[in-house]
Amino acid sequence: MNIYIMDGLNGITDIIDSFRSVIWNVQYYGVNDFELILAGNAKNINRLTVGKLLVREGDFSAGKYENVMIIETRELSFSVDEGWLLTVRGSGLKNILSRRIVWNQTNLTGKVEPIIRQVITDNVIDPVVPERKIDNFIMDAEQGFSDEIQSTESDNQLSGDNIAEWMESICKTYSIGWDVYINNSKYVFKLYRGEDRTFNQSINVPVVFSPEYDNLINSKYTYDITEFKNAGVVAGEGEGSAQAVVSVGNASGLDRFEMYIDGSSVSSNGEIITQQTYLKLLTDFGDSELKATQTLEKVEGEVVANGLYKINRDYYLGDLVQIVNEYNISAETRIVEVIYSEDENGSTLVPTFSDWSDD
C-alpha cells in the first residue's frame, strides 16, 4: 500500500512507497489515529513535518479524500539493529473539532441532527467571534435523522465542552457516525448511520460472522452485572431539609441495587420553572444515570478480514452485523472501528465490534 502526502487542501504533493510499518485506525464514534514508522533519512524528515496530511491509496478519488490523517508528533530514534527510524503519529481530520469548544451556553432540545449542525455552525463555520472560524469548513447535506434529544441528557445544556469529545459522546448515545473529509478543497463535516445487515431486517443481505462460516477466528462472550444499579435517590438543589430529593427505580428485595445520584448539575434556572417541572428533570436525570449502569453484555471477536465477507464491499464501518459463536449465542453488533496494519509480515484488517449496550 502506498501513502500519499498532502499539503493541506492543495492536494497530493508526494508519495511514500516504502516504510517499516503502519497502523491506520478509523472509527465510527471516535477520532481516527495512525502510526507510521519509516527510515529516518533526510528526505523523510524534511517532508513529514507536523501539520502535513496523509492519505492512503484507495481513500481518494476525483478531489475527494477520506480517512485523512494529520501528523501531530515526530520521533527520531536510533538503534544498532535498525539504524535511524522516524515515527510519525497523529489523528484524523475529526480532531480539527478538538480545537474548538462550545463557546456560549447552548440548549439541547429537539432533534439531535439539527442540534449537532447548529453547534458546528455556531462554533466552527459562522461563530460570533471571527477568529474562531475555520476557513473552508462546510457541512454535508442533512440526513433527516428522526432521533430526539432525550430529556435525560443531564440538564440539556452545553457550555465549554470540547466539541470533538461531545461529538463522540452524543453520537454514541444515538448510534450516529460522524466524519470530516476533504472534497473540492473544502473540509466537509458529515453525519451518517451504518446499514443494518443483521437477521432482523430483509433489505440487505445479512453479514454473519461465525465458526460455521470459518470467518470468526476467536470470540469472547461477556455478561457482567458488577456495575449494575436499578434504584436510587437523586439529590438536587438546596441543603439539609430544603434539598430537592427524588427516588428512582421500583425494584425490591434482593433484586434491588441502589446508588446515590448527585443531581446538583440539574438547574431550576433560578426558580423560573415550577417545582413539579424541576422534580421531573431530577427524575429524568436519575433515570439516565441508572441507565449508564446497566448490565454489560457483549461479544468480542477477531474476524477473517478477507474471508466470506470483505470490508468496504460487503459491510462498512458503522454497519450492524450478526455474530454467532460456538455456543450459538447470537448478537447484533456494530462495526465501530477498523484497524488496518501493515509491516514486513504482511497486512491485516481487523474490525472492532461495539458492546450490545451501545446499540
Where are these regions (language model features)?
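Beta-strand-rich assembly/attachment modules of structural machines
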Residues: M1-Q118, P127-V128
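Acidic, small/polar-enriched beta strand-loop surface segments
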Residues: N2, T198-T293, V299-G301, A305-N345, ...
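Short, surface-exposed beta-strand/loop "edge" segments at domain boundaries and coil↔beta transitions
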Residues: G11-D14, K43-N46, S61-Y65, N95-R99, ...
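Oligomerization/assembly interface segments of phage tail-like spikes and tubes
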Residues: W24-A42, G83-I96, V234, T293-G307, ...
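Residues that flank catalytic or metal-binding motifs in active/ligand-binding sites
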Residues: N32, N67, L86, Y174, ...
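Well-ordered beta-strand positions in beta-sheet-rich domains
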Residues: Y65-I70, T87, P206, V245, ...
